[in-house]
């Protein structure tokens, strides 16, 4: 697996930012230390994804699901990460439901994107017309009420 990591990397700026946020302000780290962290992260990701793939294969699944990753973490004895990751998964699923609801609202309308755009443009036109009409008629109303 270590040989495979020559072809992939983690974004150095992202890793640098993560390390900087974790370290005390008075601590520094070298580029070599950052490279070791990057390579360790890559190796961890490769091991975890390989184990999760194995878990999916054992269930005759062709897609790795979050449950497979969690089982892989258990198998690798990283149980302390699981509650945190399950919370992240719940938050992600919640945000996906909101997105799906928004997306399905337009799909359920039965209208094409072009038709929806045309309706939106018409609503804008009507709104501008009302705004223009109100701004023209308001001075007259204020003169009448004097």
Swiss-Prot record:
**Complex formation:** Component of the NC2 (negative cofactor 2) complex composed of BUR6 and NCB2. The NC2 complex associates with SPT15/TBP. Interacts with SPT15/TBP.
Any GO molecular function:
RNA polymerase II general transcription initiation factor activity
Q: Which named protein is this? A: Negative cofactor 2 complex subunit beta
Q: What Gene3D superfamilies does this protein's entry cite?
A: Histone, subunit A
In its UniProt record, which GO terms are filed under biological process? cellular response to heat; negative regulation of RNA polymerase II transcription preinitiation complex assembly; negative regulation of transcription by RNA polymerase II; negative regulation of transcription by RNA polymerase III; positive regulation of transcription by RNA polymerase II; regulation of RNA polymerase II transcription preinitiation complex assembly; RNA polymerase II preinitiation complex assembly
Please tell me where this protein is predominantly located.
nucleus
Additional record remark: Present with 2950 molecules/cell in log phase SD medium.
Q: Where is this region: Disordered?
A: 124-146
Q: Which GO terms describe its cellular component?
A: negative cofactor 2 complex; nucleus
The record's keywords, sorted A to Z, are:
Activator, Nucleus, Phosphoprotein, Repressor, Transcription, Transcription regulation
What positions belong to coiled-coil segments?
Answer: none
Phosphoserine modification sites are 135, 137, 142
Query: InterPro entries per the record?
Result: CBFA_NFYB_domain, Histone-fold, Ncb2
Question: What organism is this sequence from?
Answer: Saccharomyces cerevisiae (strain ATCC 204508 / S288c)
- Say if the entry is tagged with keyword Zinc-finger: no
Known role: Component of the NC2 complex which represses RNA polymerase II transcription through binding to SPT15/TBP and thereby inhibiting the assembly of the preinitiation complex. The NC2 complex may also mediate transcriptional activation from TATA-driven promoters through association with SPT15/TBP.
State the source organism's domain of life.
Eukaryota
Which compartments does it reside in? Nucleus
């Amino acid at each position: 697996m270590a040989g495979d990591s020559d072809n992939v990397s983690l974004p150095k700026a992202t890793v640098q930012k993560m390390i900087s946020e974790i370290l005390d302000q008075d601590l520094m780290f070298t580029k070599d230390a950052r490279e070791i962290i990057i390579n360790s992260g890559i190796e961890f990701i490769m091991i975890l994804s390989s184990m999760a793939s194995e878990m999916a294969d054992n269930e005759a699944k062709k897609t790795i699901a979050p449950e497979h990753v969690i089982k892989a973490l258990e198998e690798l004895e990283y149980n302390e990460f699981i509650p945190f990751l399950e919370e992240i998964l719940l938050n992600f699923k919640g945000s996906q439901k909101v997105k799906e609801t928004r997306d399905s609202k337009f799909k359920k309308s039965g209208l094409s994107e072009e038709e929806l755009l045309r309706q939106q443009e018409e609503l804008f036109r009507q709104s501008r017309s009302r705004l223009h009409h109100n701004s023209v008629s308001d001075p007259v109303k204020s003169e009448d009420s004097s």
